[in-house]
């Protein structure tokens, strides 16, 4: 049976109106996304009063970061016909679920590890076309293949942007009309969940709103976070920098041999001298996933194409603990998989996305300027 491609919506107008268009167009997926994460709080024993109090605390943090984000979420909620709290939950699910688990006496912290992911950037000097190529495999719950979407936002106050995101979310990975692109990977350290901070998805959204690469870097490097995360930034001007972020500090990693490759373990020697790596029990295969991608890219030659990056991301070494992860039981009994493969060309404003790539090799090309096109199988 053919796997459904991710639906696309293009929105414009003021924040609330953009959100309303989004929620209306993708009502069923937004509801499914809300149910997926709301169910987790139910399983942790949260009644409606406790759930609302927990989510409102994060809404306050988001509003301080940017009130327009809350306006857009209100529009999504109204368009989809779901409570506002549910949309906040989608956008702060990492932080909300982690806080709920810490408050639940009987919760196993390994029940719901965060996103996996393997990301890479091919710089201009290694690119066959002379243009940056930026991509990622997103590893998470297999059912998110049925809740994720591609969103295009037409803005009057900054660059348009394109993002692959869970329905109801404001951003995950993506690129904008100024040539800035971002992907992000799960990291964990002993500094996590000790301070208030901005939900990670909102920081990624902030990046996509920036006209200048320097301001995108500032959003990543200086915004306080609740938890660690790796954020990989690139620009159509030819540069990429990876930031391994602790909640209160960021550690840059620069390209080597025209490449940046990152999985889910800390690499910065400075970071490792200052904090403790705590995420490996959830993602032990991270230690070879980035090595495999780099090796395959180097073997492909001195000049690389989008097809070379796709081929590296389709790697099955160590399956099912591979770069391209087939659906397999996760630690909580749910199915875990590479939900999507995303390949971006920031200079062209295009993003090619394949759902469940271990089972499917059909990509759809999404664009800042054109309608989506389904491509021939890779």
Q: What do the predicted segments below correspond to?
A:
Residues 93-202, 218, 339-343, 351-353, ...:
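Internal mixed beta-strand/loop scaffold within catalytic domains of large alpha/beta enzymes
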Residues 203-208:
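Short, well-ordered beta-strand elements within core beta-sheets of diverse protein domains
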Residues 1-116, 209-252, 256-378:
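C-terminus-biased signal that marks the final domain/tail of proteins
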């Amino acid at each position: 049976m053919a796997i459904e491609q991710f639906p696309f919506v293009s929105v414009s107008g003021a924040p609330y109106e953009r959100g309303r268009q989004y929620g209306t167009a993708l009502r069923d997926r937004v509801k499914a996304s809300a149910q997926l994460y709301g169910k987790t709080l139910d399983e942790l024993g949260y009644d409606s009063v406790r759930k609302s109090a927990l989510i409102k605390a994060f809404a306050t943090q988001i509003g301080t970061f940017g009130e327009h984000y809350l306006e857009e979420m209100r529009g999504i909620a109204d368009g989809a016909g779901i409570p506002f709290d549910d949309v906040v939950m989608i956008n702060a699910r990492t932080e909300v679920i982690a806080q709920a688990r810490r408050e639940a006496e009987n919760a196993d912290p390994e029940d719901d590890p965060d996103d996996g992911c393997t990301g890479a950037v091919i710089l201009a000097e290694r690119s066959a076309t002379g243009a940056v190529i930026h991509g990622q495999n997103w590893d998470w719950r297999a059912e998110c293949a049925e809740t994720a979407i591609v969103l295009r936002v037409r803005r009057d106050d900054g660059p348009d942007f394109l993002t692959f995101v869970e329905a109801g979310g404001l951003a995950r990975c993506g690129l904008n009309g100024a040539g800035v692109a971002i992907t992000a990977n799960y990291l964990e350290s002993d500094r996590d969940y000790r301070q208030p901070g901005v939900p990670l998805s909102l920081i990624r959204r902030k990046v996509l709103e920036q006209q200048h690469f320097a301001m995108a870097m500032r959003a990543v490097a200086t915004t306080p976070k609740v938890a660690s995360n790796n954020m990989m930034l690139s620009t159509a001007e030819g540069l990429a920098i990876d930031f391994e972020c602790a909640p209160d500090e960021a550690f840059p990693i620069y390209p080597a041999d025209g490449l940046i490759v990152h999985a889910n373990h800390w690499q910065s020697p400075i970071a490792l001298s200052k904090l403790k790596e705590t995420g490996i029990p959830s993602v032990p295969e991270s230690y070879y996933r980035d090595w495999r991608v780099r090796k395959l890219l180097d073997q492909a030659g001195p000049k690389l194409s989008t097809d070379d990056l796709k081929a590296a991301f389709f790697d099955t070494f160590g399956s099912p603990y591979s770069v391209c992860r087939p659906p397999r039981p996760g630690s909580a009994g749910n199915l875990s998989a590479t939900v999507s493969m995303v390949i971006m060309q920031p200079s062209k404003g295009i993003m090619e996305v394949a759902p469940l790539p271990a089972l499917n090799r059909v990509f759809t090309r999404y664009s800042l300027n054109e309608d989506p096109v389904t491509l021939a199988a890779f």
